[in-house]
């Protein structure tokens, strides 16, 4: 049986612990009616449990060596193994007509944040996303307001998803072992259908505010304030960005658009 050599340039760290792989697969147990897209399956340690548990699985893998291994190891998946880059692949071709599906994966550390920005672009089709990533990033995504981990992605994802930090995974169960611990999270889409403000404006406010997170909003947002803005007496401007909830950022954006 062939094996795949982990490639540092692709951020590959292959999970060896089968019990952890099964626990990750179980994070989608309430969504078996929906197809699943696994990102970066590597040698299929998670894939095998998704299949055993009855999921309709598709996988997308950028590494040609891993793709060859998967096609040999999982012949029943041959037409559902996509060789490509999740960040740029036209996902509407896999799930046309707005079809709902779930995401899962042992996400490459070097692009984990980019994966979740891509999730935001296709969120209307994804009611649940779970998987493993660098613990620091996982904690950041799930962080509530007021914590040092709370940041841009925390706000933008929590606008649309409820995020749970499920458990920590030690570096020793990977080949090769990463230099940091990993964390498993689950995102479940909330009931929000649309925003009462411009989404583009909201993203600008959030990114600008956290770009100078030690400053109060009165100072950090000066560069994007509309001409003649005179509402600095509002209490929100004396706060720092990590003190604002996602809904607070919506209210702030509406205030700036008045």
UniProtKB/Swiss-Prot annotation:
Keywords: Cytoplasm, Methyltransferase, RNA-binding, rRNA processing, S-adenosyl-L-methionine, Transferase. GO terms for cellular component: cytosol. PANTHER family: DIMETHYLADENOSINE TRANSFERASE, DIMETHYLADENOSINE TRANSFERASE-RELATED. It is an enzyme of class 2 (transferase). Specifically dimethylates two adjacent adenosines (A1518 and A1519) in the loop of a conserved hairpin near the 3'-end of 16S rRNA in the 30S particle. May play a critical role in biogenesis of 30S subunits. SMART domains: rADc. This is Ribosomal RNA small subunit methyltransferase A. Its EC number is 2.1.1.182. The keyword Coiled coil does not apply. It is found in: Cytoplasm. InterPro entries: KsgA/Erm, rRNA_Ade_diMease-like_C, rRNA_Ade_Mease_Trfase_CS, rRNA_Ade_methylase_Trfase_N, rRNA_adenine_dimethylase, SAM-dependent_MTases_sf. Its main location: cytoplasm. S-adenosyl-L-methionine binds at residues 13, 15, 40, 61, 85, 106. Belongs to the class I-like SAM-binding methyltransferase superfamily. rRNA adenine N(6)-methyltransferase family. RsmA subfamily. HAMAP family: 16SrRNA_methyltr_A. It comes from Porphyromonas gingivalis (strain ATCC BAA-308 / W83). It catalyses: adenosine(1518)/adenosine(1519) in 16S rRNA + 4 S-adenosyl-L-methionine = N(6)-dimethyladenosine(1518)/N(6)-dimethyladenosine(1519) in 16S rRNA + 4 S-adenosyl-L-homocysteine + 4 H(+). One of its GO terms (molecular function) is 16S rRNA (adenine(1518)-N(6)/adenine(1519)-N(6))-dimethyltransferase activity. It comes from the Bacteria.
């Amino acid at each position: 049986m062939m094996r795949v050599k982990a490639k540092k340039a692709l951020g590959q760290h292959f999970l060896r612990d089968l019990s952890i792989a099964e626990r990750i697969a179980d994070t989608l147990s309430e969504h078996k009616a929906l197809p699943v897209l696994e990102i970066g399956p590597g040698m299929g340690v998670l894939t095998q449990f998704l299949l055993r548990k009855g999921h309709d699985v598709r996988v997308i893998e950028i590494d040609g060596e891993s793709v060859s291994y998967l096609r040999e190891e999982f012949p029943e998946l041959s037409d559902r193994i996509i060789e490509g880059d999740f960040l740029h692949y036209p996902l509407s071709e896999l799930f046309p007509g707005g079809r709902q599906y779930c995401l899962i994966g042992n996400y490459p550390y070097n692009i984990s944040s980019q994966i979740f920005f891509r999730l935001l672009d296709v969120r209307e089709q994804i009611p649940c996303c779970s998987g493993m990533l660098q613990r620091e990033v996982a904690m950041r995504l799930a962080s509530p307001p007021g914590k040092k981990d709370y940041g841009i992605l925390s706000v933008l994802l929590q606008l649309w998803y409820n995020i749970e930090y499920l458990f920590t995974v030690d570096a020793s169960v990977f080949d090769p072992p990463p230099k940091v611990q990993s964390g498993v999270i689950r995102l479940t889409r909330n009931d929000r259908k649309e925003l009462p403000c411009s989404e583009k404006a909201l993203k600008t406010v959030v990114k600008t505010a956290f770009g100078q997170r030690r400053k109060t909003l009165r100072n950090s947002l000066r560069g994007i304030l509309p001409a003649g803005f005179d509402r600095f007496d509002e209490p929100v401007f004396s706060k720092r960005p990590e003190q604002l909830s996602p809904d607070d950022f919506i209210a702030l954006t509406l205030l700036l658009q008045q």
